């Protein structure tokens, strides 16, 4: 039992608490009214990236999946995409946690944050341009290149903000102090 169980317990608690934080951040930000209902701010990746940069790709990916609950409901279940197609939000957000977790071992937190989003960005573009027209032809007329660029532009602005936050958190080792360890 001992150390391994204690470490696993801390990891579960860390991922669960960050998952909750990410969903609270998502609830607060996706509720902000915007001119286009399917283009809303979403800062849930703050939690994904905290876990990815502190605990690596596996836990970052799990946290990415957990923080996608609110965006999945907002844009999938209650949005244009429905629960089946909207379900792809979950692995896409997880992908950012996995990628940033790997990159965070070699790069500064800000760069790992920004580069960690690149695979999700590409997959999101493909989702809008290939998956939505095929599975949701009634929605396809609204998913134009301009719409996709607006969604991705908004996401890059969010990730830029989150990159600054991650630099500050890692530089001051805020999470390390909370967890009782220093890097």
Task: Please describe what each predicted stretch is.
Residues 1-183:
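Loop-helix junctions at membrane interfaces
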